[in-house]
Swiss-Prot record:
Sites where the protein binds substrate: D90, S91, G92, G93, F94, D144, Q189, G215
Highest classification ranks of the organism: Bacteria, Pseudomonadati, Campylobacterota, Epsilonproteobacteria, Campylobacterales
Assembly and binders: Homodimer. Within each dimer, one monomer is responsible for RNA recognition and catalysis, while the other monomer binds to the replacement base PreQ1.
Protein purpose: Catalyzes the base-exchange of a guanine (G) residue with the queuine precursor 7-aminomethyl-7-deazaguanine (PreQ1) at position 34 (anticodon wobble position) in tRNAs with GU(N) anticodons (tRNA-Asp, -Asn, -His and -Tyr). Catalysis occurs through a double-displacement mechanism. The nucleophile active site attacks the C1' of nucleotide 34 to detach the guanine base from the RNA, forming a covalent enzyme-RNA intermediate. The proton acceptor active site deprotonates the incoming PreQ1, allowing a nucleophilic attack on the C1' of the ribose to form the product.
A Gene Ontology BP annotation from the UniProt entry: queuosine biosynthetic process
Keyword Hydrolase: no
Protein name (database record): Queuine tRNA-ribosyltransferase
Amino acid sequence: MDFQLQATDNNARAGLLNLAHSQVATPVFMPVGTQGCIKSLDATDAQEILGAKLILANTYHMYLRPGEKVVEELGGLHRFAQFYGSFLTDSGGFQAFSLSDNVKLQEDGIVFKSHIDGSKHLFTPAKVLDIQYSLNSDIMMVLDDLVGLPAPLKRLEESIKRSAKWANMSLEYHKEKNRPSNNLFAIIQGGTHLKMRSLSVGLTHEGFDGYAIGGLAVGESADEMLETIAHTAPLLPKDKPRYLMGVGTPENILDAISLGVDMFDCVMPTRNARNATLFTHSGKISIKNAPYKLDNTPIEENCACYACKRYSKAYLHHLFRAKELTYARLASLHNLHFYLELVKNARNAILEKRFLSFKKEFLEKYNSRSH
């Protein structure tokens, strides 16, 4: 993978990721397509309407259903999903912990039971890479030991040592496979303990294609999260992309960009959309509320998304109240457009050396009202 750092503005960065299936401008927000699709959207929505170049799918879910060998036999995840941009796949470790009963953490991996049928499985560093090779992921994440917060210092230390060990094992295994189109990212752990974060970086070998800051948005405060990012990001190689996993709000994303983060994913835009919360530059609105029943204006004036160019708030209000499936599609298209435009505009501001003023103006308006 080739990563070109094009510009910086203080610590904020703009770059280009050259992947096997697409060139991706950073900062980038990756819509979450856990099961190989973004909920309520298809590949045409993702590629042609949203213009997404990189989306996230999940190893745990694709492994359990339909099975990575099924996907491989059908031509890999891109052909299977008919999405010809790029895929990043998470290792599935988080889902193994969070969705399964009787999870057992071992030195060689994670033993878990399927949330679908109760069958028993073992994820090892090599196993999760083999699954991702079968999917033909453009970016693969290593298996890591994620800790919920707050956590005792001893547990954090165990987590970072195990995560670093698994990451380094994954790197050696990946080198043996000689698959340059499948890029491998390491994950830095350590909770909000800054010394543990430094130790995690120090224990993780160089040579990965990118580095992720994991283990955040799992119970810590916003200030703790930002302090952790501010400490960790400068420790990572400058010539590699930096990925903040599972975070988050528009404010979180702009704060993290200002601290040197390049890549983001979160279910928030689509999950909020399905639950009637829509993003606008003046804050969030709840489309289920009564005032929108007769509102003939778009979700946001001057928004170029598919929904705003065609439909009114009144129509979206009606679809939500009627529990029509079309509502989820239109609302998700709007919210994802908002997120993708946010990082696009942030990138342009970095290129033009005006990121801090862009961020300030955006947040002043965004936080002015939510209704």
